[in-house]
Amino acid sequence: MGFKCGIIGLPNVGKSTLFNVLTKGNSAVANFPFCTIKPNIGIVSVPDNRINNLSKIILPKKITNAFIEFVDIAGLVKGASKGEGLGNQFLSNIRDTHAIAHVVRCFKDDNVSHIYNQLQPKIDVDIINSELILADFETCEKSILKLQKKLNFNKKEIEEKLVVLSKCLDHLKKFLMLKTLELDENEKKIISYLRFLTLKPTMYIANINEQKESCFFLNELEKMAKKEGSSVIPINSNLELDLIKMNEDEQKYFMKSFNITNLGLNNIIKSGYKILNLITFFTAGIKEVRAWAIPNGSTSLQAADKIHSDFRRGFIRAQIINYLDFIKYKSETKVKEAGKYRSEGKFYQIQDGDIINFLFNV
């Protein structure tokens, strides 16, 4: 199963352009609403210098980065929760993702129309978030009614669900997103089957240009995002789309000329990885050095299953080397001599950067 981050926003804010930057692809881009009808899905490599450093020592035949999926979902509009603009279909597409990248237009351009003929990023964000809240309210209300009819069966379990859902409904009635409601891990687990939209981790993507107004709009967006504990990643999508079409030398020259030290593209991918709460472990050998993405808190048995179900079924133990130890000692033999080579069982909690060799028998 891939880890999916859904790209959402109003029509004409630059979602498909951003998707093309992320995937270096050719998703349809046009100056009219609902250019994207069916969601485009792109597999995006996660930049990680550690895999390059390991490869310089091991010299493998193949290098494979960890990846996450970005899903380009069509623009939402007012009334989406009631079916406006094919809203039900698009809200369903968001429900299928694990996290949200909310693209907000923070630039003026007379050649690109705004669906409501006014550029106010805060209002744009409120429109989208309001639709997500309304959709969650409807989901919550329907679920409560269904559960109340089943109270004679599994009474204890149903009452437990009703307590949490009533808490959620009261919060949504105040037009507040569920991510701002204090829920413990058990409560989140109880309602996880409903896949609430406003409970999904979110990052805001500020689509900017070189104009002064972009700085003002960006500051406003950052203030708003801070209140809900979300991050804001600025990117000039059109500029970076031009950059990825250049060869490496041209790209370096252009970035140096315009004093660009870091691409927004990489920041978005890394932030997506972070809000999905993923960590990386490595498998390393002459054939391949590979990075694997797993949820933080995963056990060695779950990591084994990520590679192949046979690894999980026949699991014996996991041989672990810390990434920094391998970089320091340069080989497995020297790591062992230094006493830094470990053998762990199936309940060991994987740490970010672990290099793992799984022993199994089927």
From Swiss-Prot:
Family annotation (InterPro entries): ATPase_YchF/OLA1 (IPR004396), Beta-grasp_dom_sf (IPR012675), G_OBG (IPR031167), GTP-bd (IPR006073), P-loop_NTPase (IPR027417), TGS (IPR004095), TGS-like (IPR012676), TGS-like_dom_sf (IPR023192)
Positions with a binding annotation for Mg(2+): 16, 36
Cofactor(s) the protein requires to work: Mg(2+)
Ranges for domain OBG-type G: 3-255
Signal peptide positions (record): none
Pfam families (alphabetical): MMR_HSR1, YchF-GTPase_C
One MF annotation (Gene Ontology) recorded for this entry: ATP hydrolysis activity
Domain TGS: 277-360
Residues that hold ATP according to the record: 12-17
Claim: Nucleotide-binding is one of the keywords in the record: yes
Entry keywords, A to Z: ATP-binding, Magnesium, Metal-binding, Nucleotide-binding
Disulfide-bond pairs as recorded: none
GO CC annotation terms, alphabetical: cytoplasm
Transmembrane intervals: none
Domain of life: Bacteria
Function recorded in the entry: ATPase that binds to both the 70S ribosome and the 50S ribosomal subunit in a nucleotide-independent manner.
Family: Belongs to the TRAFAC class OBG-HflX-like GTPase superfamily. OBG GTPase family. YchF/OLA1 subfamily.
PANTHER family for the chain: OBG GTPASE FAMILY, OBG-TYPE G DOMAIN-CONTAINING PROTEIN
Protein name: Ribosome-binding ATPase YchF
Species in which this protein is naturally found: Buchnera aphidicola subsp. Schizaphis graminum (strain Sg)
